[in-house]
Every structure is written in C-alpha cells, then in structure tokens.
C-alpha cells in the first residue's frame, strides 16, 4: 500500500542522508525542488500518486510562467525524477513509463554565462577605484588564472594544497583530483588574500581569507558560511561590473565559463578544456583520451591569460 505522503517522506529521508554525508549543497538543491513542488501541489505531504505526467507538465509550465530559467526548471525536474525513482526502487511508488517525458530535463546551452574578451579584460584589469571592489577583482582574477576554478574550490583551498608552484586539490563538486600550476602573475594576489588564521585541530586550514577556519569540513554551519560568502562575492562582482560599466550579467560562474570560452576561441581542443576544468566527461570520447600533462595545461592557461591581458578593444 502506497503511503499518502510517500513522495515527501522519501525526499526528506534522502535529504537527511545527504546532510549526514556532509553533502549540504546537494541537499539544498533537493530541498528547494521539494519545497517548490509541494507549494504547487498545495500540500507539504505529497504522495507518489500525486506525481502524474499531467501534473508534472502543468508544474513545468507554472515554473516557466513564474520566470524561472530553463536550466533551473530542468534542475527541479531532475531532482523530482530522482526522488520518484528512489521510491520505485524501494517498492513505495508505482513504475510509470515515460513519467517525465513531457517536461524539460536537459541543459539549455543558450544561457550563455561567458564574457567577451573585451569585457573580461575590463573586469580583471581596469581599476575599480575601490579597495572593497579591488579585493573582489583579485578573487575573480585568481579564479581565471587557476584555469577557471570555481568559487567553491577557491574558497575551500587549504594551505596544504599549495605545493611550491603547483596547487593540488580535489574538486568540491566531483572530488576529481586537480593540479594547477601557479603562474608568476598570481603570486602577489595569493599573498594579498593569504589567510593568517591560526589552525584549529580537525578544522581546515584555509589558504585564503574567504572562509573561517573554525568549523569542521562537513559541519552544516560551514556550508551556511560558504553560502553567505558566495552571495557576498556575487553581489560584489555585480558591483564591480557596474563600476567598470559592463553591460553583461556576471556571477561566480562567469569566470569559469569565460576561461573555457576563451580557450575554445583560441582553438584549444575541447578535451583539453574539459580536463583543465575538472569535468568528469565530455560525452563518451573522453573515456579513451589520454590525460594531458600539467605542462600542456599550463601552456593553455598562459595563452588564455596573455590573450585577455593584452586584449584591446577595437584592435
């Protein structure tokens, strides 16, 4: 017999498990999807039988009319699908063929997040005439110079990751081992952001003064602190863009996408870009592609930096 609130209970159980594993970011996404769908259904106790093909279709239309972007809608739908499939595997939900067939679960590549070379040059090199914005500019510049490193990875770098002139770390999102050579142009910026916090036993000794080193790695308080730091960085990045008179929208993703777009424009193979970003795959072809040496990836990174640094509008 199916529980009347089985879908919600299944979701909450999985969200709780993610939190116990310290996967607070993933748990947060599932929680948002569940909250949104529950609100649409008009109840906090959604049953599996309420998850129908027609209701999902209408829910997707509702999200679109609320102004959500296709990729956000897709994320919600994929979270709901994952929860439903867990219910099916547990024998708590009926198997319904093509249940999510009428809703969007792809990735809209039209939602471009990269800046043009000219805008990127302004963002990273023009004087914002503000110490607060200059610090934001330094963080953005390091993200770009570290092969389009994500803000999450940059903020969570520990001092032990810096091995002479190479950063060695595991990506926060995928746990993929990464190595990035520190270019000479980054050394001064590293010193400016260096964290002087005293290390605390069993707590991360962060490299940069972005997060406090007084919380254990999987503590939910540490996740909340990171979310606060991310919001602050995004807000200040927008302030920086306004101060430099940029018209394009910017966010923490902008530097990562702009690094990849710059490399693609320069003719760098997609396989090299994927590996430099720490992506797990680029379709099935990457399964048999040889890994690129650090030296090769460093040359790509140097080329990207030189291209943007020396870029001049109207050339």
Which residue ranges define each predicted feature?
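Catalytic-site neighborhood detector that most strongly recognizes the C-terminal catalytic loop/helix
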Residues: 114, 171-175, 213-215, 277-302
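Short, basic (Lys/Arg/His-rich) helix/loop patches that form interaction surfaces
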Residues: 129, 225, 234-275
């Amino acid at each position: 017999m199916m529980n009347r609130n089985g879908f919600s209970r299944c979701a909450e159980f999985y969200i709780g498990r993610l939190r116990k594993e310290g996967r607070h970011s993933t748990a947060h996404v599932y929680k948002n999807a569940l909250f949104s769908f529950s609100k649409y259904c008009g109840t906090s106790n959604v049953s599996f039988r309420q998850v129908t093909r027609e209701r999902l279709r209408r829910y997707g239309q509702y999200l679109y009319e609320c102004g959500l972007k296709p990729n956000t809608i897709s994320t919600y739908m994929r979270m709901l699908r994952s929860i439903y499939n867990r219910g099916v595997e547990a024998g708590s939900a009926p198997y319904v063929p093509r249940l999510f067939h009428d809703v969007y679960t792809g990735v809209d590549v039209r939602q471009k997040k990269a800046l043009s070379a000219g805008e990127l040059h302004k963002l990273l090199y023009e004087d914002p005439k503000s110490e607060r914005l200059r610090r934001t500019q330094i963080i953005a510049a390091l993200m770009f110079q570290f092969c389009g490193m994500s803000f999450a990875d940059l903020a969570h770098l520990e001092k032990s990751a810096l091995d002479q002139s190479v950063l060695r770390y595991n990506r926060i999102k995928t746990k993929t081992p990464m190595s990035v050579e520190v270019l000479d142009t980054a050394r001064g910026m590293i010193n400016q952001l260096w964290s002087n916090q005293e290390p605390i036993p069993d707590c991360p000794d962060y490299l940069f003064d972005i997060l406090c080193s007084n919380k254990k790695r999987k503590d939910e308080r540490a996740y909340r602190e990171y979310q606060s730091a991310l919001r602050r960085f995004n807000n200040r990045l927008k302030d920086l863009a306004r101060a430099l008179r940029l018209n394009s929208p910017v966010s923490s993703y902008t530097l990562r996408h702009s690094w990849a777009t710059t490399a693609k424009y320069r003719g760098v193979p997609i396989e090299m870009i994927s590996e430099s970003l720490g992506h797990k795959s680029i379709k099935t072809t990457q399964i048999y592609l040889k890994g690129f040496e650090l030296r090769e990836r460093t040359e790509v990174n140097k080329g990207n930096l030189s291209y943007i640094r020396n870029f001049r509008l109207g050339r």
